[in-house]
């Protein structure tokens, strides 16, 4: 799908999708899972070739940030959620050529939706492709800040459940949610680092107007301020995970201790029963009238005595 936007009164205005001849007026062309026909339209009409989705997965810096005859290229990760609402990252290709921004992605992304909604009312100061690019990055950082706040709130709730130490369904659910928070934080960290590298490359390779240069530096400062917060969440996740494992180990040790003490407690009684269960021909107690009650009494005494001792020691 091709989404094309042109400038009208310093605002982004969406162009008619059916009228592809208007693409020459576009300042921003956003492609979402473009078909081969749509790629050919761009190639024939604007002489612009697009990266393949396989190239978007490359993580080497030389493959993600470079400049060639087709323009300035940036590949950047955007935070999103998959079909099962788990944290995910989508790689977006940005290309700036002849004053026009091309974006290529394989799915709809929250940051793009939010920016398109804002662009209906937001005026552009410099009215160029670099401003659209920086605004998209700025929207992405705002989204990441919201994700960090969400993780923080969830960890506050989980900490009360885990540090309470009472194992049960709520405790098990908290462990599962904790792993999801760790995954979210790791993806936010990767996204922040990737955006930082992309903006640093952009500042080095282009001569941005003063306003946009300051905007880029402001975004970089926002990233630097968010990174310590995200790292502190990582540390809190690790602390809660270690605390949860500690409580689980304590509970397992308590169970093993109980069974160990119980087995030792009944060992003397088992010894008495084994003694009188032997099949020797001459056993005086077998002819004793009260031999059976005596054996039962010995077994009870052999069991009760260790129990009372262990109880006094606090082992039970």
From Swiss-Prot:
Key words, A-Z: Cell inner membrane, Cell membrane, Ion transport, Magnesium, Membrane, Transmembrane, Transmembrane helix, Transport
Transmembrane portions of the chain: 258-278, 290-310
Localization of this protein: Cell inner membrane
Catalytic function, reaction form: Mg(2+)(in) = Mg(2+)(out)
GO cellular component: plasma membrane
InterPro entries tied to this protein: CorA_cytoplasmic_dom (IPR045861), CorA_MIT (IPR050829), CorA_TM1_TM2 (IPR045863), Mg/Co-transport_prot_CorA (IPR004488), MgTranspt_CorA/ZnTranspt_ZntB (IPR002523)
Placement of sequence motif Probable selectivity filter: 277-279
CDD domains on file: EcCorA-like_1
Pfam families cross-referenced by the UniProt entry: CorA
Marked site: Essential for ion permeation: 253
GO molecular function (one): magnesium ion transmembrane transporter activity
Membrane topology of this protein: Multi-pass membrane protein
Family as reported in the entry's similarity comment: Belongs to the CorA metal ion transporter (MIT) (TC 1.A.35) family.
Summary of subunit composition and partner proteins: Homopentamer. In the absence of Mg(2+), interactions between subunits are weakened, and dimers, trimers and tetramers can be observed in vitro.
Domain remarks in the Swiss-Prot or TrEMBL record: The central ion permeation pathway is formed by the first transmembrane domain from each of the five subunits. Mg(2+) binding strengthens interactions between subunits and leads to the formation of a symmetrical homopentamer surrounding a closed ion permeation pathway. Low Mg(2+) concentrations trigger both a conformation change within each subunit and a loosening of the interactions between subunits. This results in an open ion conduction pathway. In addition, this results in a less symmetrical shape of the whole complex.
Function per UniProt: Mediates influx of magnesium ions. Alternates between open and closed states. Activated by low cytoplasmic Mg(2+) levels. Inactive when cytoplasmic Mg(2+) levels are high.
Protein name (record): Magnesium transport protein CorA
Species, as recorded: Mannheimia succiniciproducens (strain KCTC 0769BP / MBEL55E)
Gene: corA
